[in-house]
């Protein structure tokens, strides 16, 4: 992760800037929360539809980066998660 002043660059498309959306992860140049897009991906929404819903403010490459970073974070922190079995 690189920093540019107080802005954290997590990749080519994803940033955390305290001056934008209180430092939440957003797509560079937008106020679109990475979390919102990842929730849309998780719900099964087609990526093309997600892009259209955000008026083409994000790209397929940006969504790919978000999914890759989320995957990496999960794999790096797996031991911190404790899942309770679902009741049958």
Regions found by a protein language model. Give the residues of each.
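A short, structured beta-strand/loop element
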Residues: 8-49
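Long, charge-rich, low-complexity alpha-helical segments
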Residues: 33-88
């Amino acid at each position: 992760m690189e920093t540019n002043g107080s802005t954290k660059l997590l990749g080519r498309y994803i940033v955390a800037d305290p001056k934008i959306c209180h430092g939440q992860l957003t797509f560079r140049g937008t106020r679109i929360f990475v979390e919102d897009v990842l929730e849309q991906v998780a719900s099964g929404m087609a990526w093309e539809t997600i892009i259209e819903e955000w008026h083409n403010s994000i790209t397929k490459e940006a969504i790919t980066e978000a999914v890759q970073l989320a995957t990496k974070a999960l794999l790096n922190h797996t031991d911190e998660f404790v899942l309770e079995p679902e009741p049958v």
